[in-house]
Amino acid sequence: MLAAARALRGPRPRWPTPAREHWTPAGRSRSRREAAEAEADVPVFQYVGERAARADRVFVWGFSFSGALGVPSFVVPSSGPGPRAGLRPRRRIQPVPYRLELDHKISSAACGYGFTLLSSKTKDVTKVWGMGLNKDSQLGFHRSRKDKTRGYEYVLEPSPVPLPLDRPQETKVLQVSCGRAHSLVLTDREGVFSMGNNSHGQCGRKVVEDEVYSESHKVHRMQDFDGQVVQVVCGQDHSLFLTDKGEVYSCGWGADGQTGLGHYNITSTPSKLGGDLAGVTVVQVATYGDCCLALSADGGVFGWGNSEYLQLASVTDSTQVNVPRCLPFSGVGKVKQVACGGTGCAVLNAEGHVFVWGYGILGKGPKLLETAIPEMIPPTLFGLTEFNPEVQVSQIRCGLSHFAALTNKGELFVWGKNIRGCLGIGRLEDQYFPWRVTMPGEPVDVACGVDHMVTLAKSFI
């Protein structure tokens, strides 16, 4: 029976056997020469040229229905050419990074309350793009395609923001910043431009009673500073300006003392701050809600504005501080960067350690909800191990109620309130410890908003 089966099956085919040229007896390793020859025989595949430049990428995530992510298909059902066109559902929340397709190299990004600004240092006429909520013309005037006399209150994709530049082919945009309903654009040779709601003077111009901000063409230019502005920052309804002389100017809403000008009134003209900042060279300012921080050249930290959440409790019991105060933090080392959100603050020292204080989810677990004294987040939570001893945090950012940190190894960590998926970690629960955001690129800068984020990145190859 077995013989008959073998006869029907025919002779067993002979498969090629693996070559044995590199076989060595057990217990004897190959010589260095043999190993080098074997390595030289291995084929080399070169997929990318040696001089190939890594491509620039922009990733967005969070709440999309405001249009702030710049992806129209998330807001309006797609209507492609296929037979099932229009059946793709809208996407209210994008919980993980999504690549935004752009034709320009973006150098600065800012997230406002439901809107986004992007800018490029290009010499082309168009240098700034906006997307999202535009009910106060914080993105400029965007003409309706149906009615040329009307403007859009929602901009669903990155659209050019017109600026009244005198030399558009020479002037570069260095930075953008967004508040609750106003925006600032910093240029290298034509001052600062402001757009949007000015009901508190936050755009640096006279407040006009009953001014209509919707569908407005108004873009205001500010140039009356003693020195050149090198950084602009929008708070909720106020603005901060840092000059190359290390001086800080402010304007806007001052009810919590956030203008730092010694009173609680509104200010429509950018004015220089004094207090403990008098004679101090400032290198960075930070704000997003109603509290402000400044960093001096020698690593000193100064604060003013709202202190309802213990932001300034290290120097005062008052909940509003209207002049800059030096915050005498000990044990944090030399500070090289500051960040300020709605209820929490953070500093980064020269050793790459992050310290947090204030109220809310601060990054040290659910047991730490408030503190007036900065506490260090364990460096191991940012990837520091005995196998990776060189890992350091290189940048910190604050949204309204969440934090972000970039490391020198090109990794992005986030923590805080996960409002509408703004953390980009693939789930909607709040995050009490730093958590790494995964994306197909190496993040180099990040902007935090209320319920969305934008990251500038480089492709891996």
Curated annotation (Swiss-Prot):
GO BP: mitochondrial fusion; mitochondrial large ribosomal subunit assembly
Protein name: RCC1-like G exchanging factor-like protein
Bias (Low complexity) ranges: 1-10
Principal location listed in the UniProt entry: mitochondrion
This protein's record includes keyword Membrane: yes
Metal-binding found in the keyword field: no
RCC1-type repeats, residues: 55-121, 125-188, 190-244, 245-297, 298-350, 352-408, 409-458
Tissue-wise expression: At E8.5, broadly expressed in yolk sac placenta, decidua, and embryo, with highest levels found in the trophoblast giant cells (TGCs) and ectoplacental cone (at protein level).
Organism in which the protein naturally occurs: Mus musculus (Mouse)
